[in-house]
Amino acid sequence: MLTIYAPFNNKNSKAWEVFNGVEKSWPDQITKLDNAVETDPVSNSMFWGFVGNNREMVKKLEARNHNYWFTDTPYFGRFDNSNLKPDNHYWRVCKNAIHVPYLKDCKADRFEKFGMKIKAPNFAGKYILVCPSSTGIHNYLDKPNWTNEIIEQIKRYTDRPIKLRHKPRGKGTSGPSEAKVPLSEDLKEAWCVVTSCSIAAVEAMCEGIPVFCDHKSFAVDVGNVELSDIENPYYGGPEPWLYSLAYQQFTPEEIQNGTAVEILMDKEIL
Protein backbone atom coordinates (compact mmCIF):
# COMPACT_ATOMS: atom_id res chain seq x y z
CA MET A 1 0.00 0.00 0.00
CA LEU A 2 1.28 3.47 -0.95
CA THR A 3 -0.34 6.33 0.95
CA ILE A 4 -0.24 9.67 -0.86
CA TYR A 5 -0.59 12.80 1.27
CA ALA A 6 -2.11 15.24 -1.20
CA PRO A 7 -3.28 18.87 -1.16
CA PHE A 8 -7.04 18.26 -1.29
CA ASN A 9 -7.61 21.98 -0.76
CA ASN A 10 -5.72 22.91 -3.95
CA LYS A 11 -6.84 21.06 -7.06
CA ASN A 12 -4.56 23.31 -9.14
CA SER A 13 -1.41 22.25 -7.28
CA LYS A 14 1.32 20.81 -9.46
CA ALA A 15 1.46 17.96 -6.95
CA TRP A 16 -1.34 16.38 -8.96
CA GLU A 17 0.96 16.07 -11.99
CA VAL A 18 2.95 13.61 -9.91
CA PHE A 19 0.15 11.92 -7.97
CA ASN A 20 -2.20 11.36 -10.92
CA GLY A 21 0.63 9.65 -12.77
CA VAL A 22 1.64 7.59 -9.75
CA GLU A 23 -1.96 6.35 -9.42
CA LYS A 24 -1.74 4.93 -12.95
CA SER A 25 1.74 3.37 -12.82
CA TRP A 26 2.83 2.55 -9.26
CA PRO A 27 3.02 -1.19 -8.47
CA ASP A 28 1.33 -0.79 -5.05
CA GLN A 29 -2.31 -0.18 -4.25
CA ILE A 30 -2.87 3.56 -3.72
CA THR A 31 -4.78 5.48 -1.08
CA LYS A 32 -4.88 9.27 -0.73
CA LEU A 33 -5.19 11.37 2.42
CA ASP A 34 -5.39 15.13 2.97
CA ASN A 35 -2.00 16.62 3.88
CA ALA A 36 -3.66 19.61 5.52
CA VAL A 37 -5.57 17.37 7.95
CA GLU A 38 -3.33 14.37 8.62
CA THR A 39 -0.49 14.67 11.13
CA ASP A 40 0.41 11.04 11.94
CA PRO A 41 1.74 9.43 8.75
CA VAL A 42 1.90 5.74 7.95
CA SER A 43 4.92 3.97 6.49
CA ASN A 44 5.40 3.91 2.71
CA SER A 45 3.95 7.39 2.22
CA MET A 46 4.46 9.83 -0.64
CA PHE A 47 4.70 13.62 -0.43
CA TRP A 48 5.12 16.55 -2.81
CA GLY A 49 7.11 19.42 -1.34
CA PHE A 50 6.70 20.83 2.15
CA VAL A 51 3.09 21.95 1.75
CA GLY A 52 0.37 21.34 4.33
CA ASN A 53 1.71 19.19 7.17
CA ASN A 54 4.26 17.43 4.97
CA ARG A 55 7.40 18.63 6.71
CA GLU A 56 6.21 17.52 10.14
CA MET A 57 5.08 14.15 8.78
CA VAL A 58 8.37 13.54 6.96
CA LYS A 59 10.28 14.29 10.17
CA LYS A 60 8.11 11.77 12.06
CA LEU A 61 8.72 9.06 9.46
CA GLU A 62 12.47 9.66 9.58
CA ALA A 63 12.46 9.46 13.38
CA ARG A 64 10.64 6.11 13.15
CA ASN A 65 12.93 4.81 10.36
CA HIS A 66 9.87 4.27 8.17
CA ASN A 67 9.97 4.35 4.38
CA TYR A 68 8.63 7.34 2.48
CA TRP A 69 8.81 8.97 -0.94
CA PHE A 70 9.40 12.67 -1.49
CA THR A 71 8.78 14.47 -4.78
CA ASP A 72 9.57 18.08 -5.63
CA THR A 73 11.22 20.41 -8.14
CA PRO A 74 13.88 18.87 -10.42
CA TYR A 75 17.60 19.51 -10.75
CA PHE A 76 17.13 20.66 -14.35
CA GLY A 77 14.12 20.92 -16.63
CA ARG A 78 11.96 22.98 -14.29
CA PHE A 79 8.40 23.83 -15.34
CA ASP A 80 7.50 27.02 -17.19
CA ASN A 81 3.98 28.13 -16.28
CA SER A 82 3.55 29.74 -19.70
CA ASN A 83 4.35 26.50 -21.54
CA LEU A 84 3.25 23.48 -19.50
CA LYS A 85 3.29 20.18 -21.38
CA PRO A 86 3.38 16.61 -20.03
CA ASP A 87 6.79 15.97 -21.58
CA ASN A 88 8.70 19.24 -21.13
CA HIS A 89 9.34 19.50 -17.39
CA TYR A 90 10.42 17.21 -14.58
CA TRP A 91 9.90 16.26 -10.93
CA ARG A 92 12.48 14.61 -8.71
CA VAL A 93 11.55 11.38 -6.92
CA CYS A 94 13.44 10.57 -3.73
CA LYS A 95 13.26 7.63 -1.33
CA ASN A 96 13.69 8.19 2.42
CA ALA A 97 15.23 11.63 1.87
CA ILE A 98 14.24 15.00 0.45
CA HIS A 99 17.00 14.79 -2.16
CA VAL A 100 18.34 11.97 -4.30
CA PRO A 101 21.54 10.00 -3.62
CA TYR A 102 24.48 9.64 -5.99
CA LEU A 103 23.99 6.57 -8.20
CA LYS A 104 27.17 5.37 -9.86
CA ASP A 105 27.36 4.20 -13.47
CA CYS A 106 24.33 6.05 -14.83
CA LYS A 107 24.35 6.67 -18.57
CA ALA A 108 24.67 10.18 -20.00
CA ASP A 109 21.57 9.99 -22.20
CA ARG A 110 19.00 11.56 -19.88
CA PHE A 111 21.31 14.42 -18.92
CA GLU A 112 22.39 15.14 -22.49
CA LYS A 113 18.79 16.01 -23.43
CA PHE A 114 19.23 19.33 -21.62
CA GLY A 115 22.22 20.48 -23.69
CA MET A 116 24.01 21.87 -20.63
CA LYS A 117 27.69 22.76 -20.98
CA ILE A 118 30.18 22.06 -18.21
CA LYS A 119 33.03 24.52 -17.74
CA ALA A 120 36.41 23.76 -16.26
CA PRO A 121 37.15 25.56 -12.97
CA ASN A 122 39.56 28.50 -13.05
CA PHE A 123 39.55 29.41 -9.34
CA ALA A 124 39.63 33.09 -10.28
CA GLY A 125 36.50 34.21 -8.42
CA LYS A 126 36.46 37.03 -5.90
CA TYR A 127 33.52 36.66 -3.51
CA ILE A 128 31.67 33.95 -1.63
CA LEU A 129 28.15 33.53 -2.99
CA VAL A 130 25.74 32.39 -0.26
CA CYS A 131 22.53 30.81 -1.59
CA PRO A 132 20.15 29.92 1.24
CA SER A 133 17.44 27.34 0.72
CA SER A 134 13.84 28.11 1.66
CA THR A 135 12.71 28.69 5.23
CA GLY A 136 10.91 25.34 5.06
CA ILE A 137 14.12 23.50 4.20
CA HIS A 138 16.05 25.23 6.98
CA ASN A 139 13.33 24.32 9.48
CA TYR A 140 13.48 20.72 8.24
CA LEU A 141 17.25 20.76 8.82
CA ASP A 142 16.65 22.19 12.33
CA LYS A 143 18.70 25.20 11.28
CA PRO A 144 16.17 28.08 11.24
CA ASN A 145 18.99 30.66 11.52
CA TRP A 146 21.15 29.00 8.86
CA THR A 147 21.86 32.15 6.84
CA ASN A 148 23.15 34.33 9.67
CA GLU A 149 25.04 31.47 11.27
CA ILE A 150 26.73 30.37 8.04
CA ILE A 151 27.86 33.92 7.23
CA GLU A 152 29.46 34.20 10.67
CA GLN A 153 31.21 30.87 10.13
CA ILE A 154 32.50 31.92 6.71
CA LYS A 155 34.05 35.04 8.24
CA ARG A 156 36.17 32.85 10.51
CA TYR A 157 37.97 31.30 7.55
CA THR A 158 38.20 34.00 4.87
CA ASP A 159 38.18 37.75 4.42
CA ARG A 160 36.69 37.53 0.93
CA PRO A 161 33.54 39.59 0.32
CA ILE A 162 30.27 37.73 0.88
CA LYS A 163 27.36 38.12 -1.52
CA LEU A 164 23.94 36.92 -0.37
CA ARG A 165 21.46 35.62 -2.94
CA HIS A 166 18.05 34.73 -1.55
CA LYS A 167 15.79 32.25 -3.30
CA PRO A 168 13.82 34.24 -5.91
CA ARG A 169 10.10 34.48 -5.14
CA GLY A 170 7.10 36.19 -6.73
CA LYS A 171 3.72 35.66 -8.39
CA GLY A 172 2.92 32.82 -6.00
CA THR A 173 5.93 30.75 -7.02
CA SER A 174 9.71 30.61 -6.62
CA GLY A 175 12.75 29.79 -8.68
CA PRO A 176 14.66 31.08 -11.72
CA SER A 177 11.60 32.54 -13.46
CA GLU A 178 11.21 35.07 -10.62
CA ALA A 179 14.86 36.12 -10.42
CA LYS A 180 15.60 39.79 -11.09
CA VAL A 181 19.27 38.87 -11.55
CA PRO A 182 20.01 35.47 -13.16
CA LEU A 183 22.08 33.07 -11.07
CA SER A 184 24.57 32.89 -13.95
CA GLU A 185 25.32 36.58 -13.42
CA ASP A 186 26.05 36.15 -9.72
CA LEU A 187 28.26 33.14 -10.47
CA LYS A 188 30.56 35.01 -12.88
CA GLU A 189 32.93 36.27 -10.19
CA ALA A 190 32.13 33.79 -7.42
CA TRP A 191 35.00 31.98 -5.71
CA CYS A 192 32.57 29.36 -4.46
CA VAL A 193 28.90 28.84 -3.62
CA VAL A 194 27.79 28.11 -0.07
CA THR A 195 24.32 26.65 0.31
CA SER A 196 22.36 24.32 2.53
CA CYS A 197 20.45 22.29 -0.08
CA SER A 198 19.70 24.74 -2.90
CA ILE A 199 19.50 23.48 -6.48
CA ALA A 200 21.76 26.44 -7.30
CA ALA A 201 24.53 23.89 -6.64
CA VAL A 202 23.83 22.31 -10.04
CA GLU A 203 24.42 25.49 -12.03
CA ALA A 204 27.46 26.33 -9.90
CA MET A 205 29.10 22.97 -10.59
CA CYS A 206 28.35 23.29 -14.31
CA GLU A 207 30.01 26.72 -14.28
CA GLY A 208 33.14 25.26 -12.66
CA ILE A 209 32.41 26.86 -9.27
CA PRO A 210 33.11 24.75 -6.14
CA VAL A 211 30.17 24.17 -3.80
CA PHE A 212 29.91 23.95 -0.01
CA CYS A 213 26.72 22.31 1.23
CA ASP A 214 24.88 20.57 4.04
CA HIS A 215 25.32 16.85 4.70
CA LYS A 216 21.71 16.33 3.53
CA SER A 217 22.27 18.10 0.21
CA PHE A 218 22.15 16.19 -3.07
CA ALA A 219 25.54 17.83 -3.84
CA VAL A 220 27.39 16.32 -0.89
CA ASP A 221 29.19 13.76 -3.09
CA VAL A 222 30.76 16.42 -5.30
CA GLY A 223 30.86 19.34 -2.89
CA ASN A 224 32.61 20.40 0.29
CA VAL A 225 31.09 20.28 3.77
CA GLU A 226 33.81 21.86 5.93
CA LEU A 227 33.97 25.65 5.70
CA SER A 228 37.53 25.52 7.01
CA ASP A 229 38.43 24.42 3.46
CA ILE A 230 36.92 27.51 1.86
CA GLU A 231 40.27 28.88 0.65
CA ASN A 232 41.23 25.49 -0.76
CA PRO A 233 37.95 24.04 -2.07
CA TYR A 234 37.59 20.67 -3.74
CA TYR A 235 36.11 20.56 -7.24
CA GLY A 236 35.75 17.25 -9.06
CA GLY A 237 34.37 16.50 -12.50
CA PRO A 238 30.59 16.57 -12.01
CA GLU A 239 29.51 14.60 -15.07
CA PRO A 240 28.74 11.21 -13.42
CA TRP A 241 26.87 13.03 -10.64
CA LEU A 242 24.82 15.00 -13.17
CA TYR A 243 23.96 11.77 -14.98
CA SER A 244 22.77 10.35 -11.65
CA LEU A 245 20.51 13.34 -11.01
CA ALA A 246 18.95 12.97 -14.46
CA TYR A 247 18.06 9.35 -13.72
CA GLN A 248 16.07 10.35 -10.64
CA GLN A 249 13.75 12.99 -12.10
CA PHE A 250 10.89 12.40 -14.50
CA THR A 251 8.32 14.19 -16.64
CA PRO A 252 4.61 13.87 -15.80
CA GLU A 253 4.33 11.74 -18.93
CA GLU A 254 7.10 9.40 -17.72
CA ILE A 255 5.49 9.10 -14.30
CA GLN A 256 2.17 8.18 -15.88
CA ASN A 257 3.37 5.77 -18.57
CA GLY A 258 5.55 3.68 -16.26
CA THR A 259 8.98 4.91 -17.40
CA ALA A 260 9.70 6.35 -13.94
CA VAL A 261 8.72 3.10 -12.21
CA GLU A 262 10.83 1.09 -14.67
CA ILE A 263 13.92 3.24 -14.03
CA LEU A 264 13.42 3.26 -10.25
CA MET A 265 13.16 -0.52 -10.29
CA ASP A 266 16.18 -0.89 -12.56
CA LYS A 267 18.22 1.26 -10.16
CA GLU A 268 16.89 -0.83 -7.23
CA ILE A 269 15.30 2.22 -5.60
CA LEU A 270 11.76 0.86 -5.88
Listing of model-derived features with the role each one plays in the protein:
Residues 6-10, 131-132, 136, 145-183:
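Catalytic donor nucleotide-activated moiety binding site of glycosyltransferases and closely related
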Residues 1-50, 55, 136-137, 261-270:
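N-terminal pre-catalytic "stem/leader" segment of glycosyltransferase-like enzymes
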Residues 1-4, 121-134:
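A short, charged/proline- and glycine-enriched loop
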Residues 34-63, 69-72, 190-196:
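Short, well-ordered secondary-structure micro-motifs within conserved domains or adaptor modules
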Residues 9-11, 51-53, 74-77, 133-137, ...:
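Short, solvent-exposed loop/turn segments at secondary-structure junctions
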Residues 33-39, 155, 163-211, 217:
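Donor nucleotide-activated moiety binding/catalytic core segment of transferases
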Residues 81-125, 221-270:
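Leloir-type glycosyltransferase catalytic cores
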Residues 52-80, 148-149, 206-220:
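A short, gly/pro- and small-residue-rich
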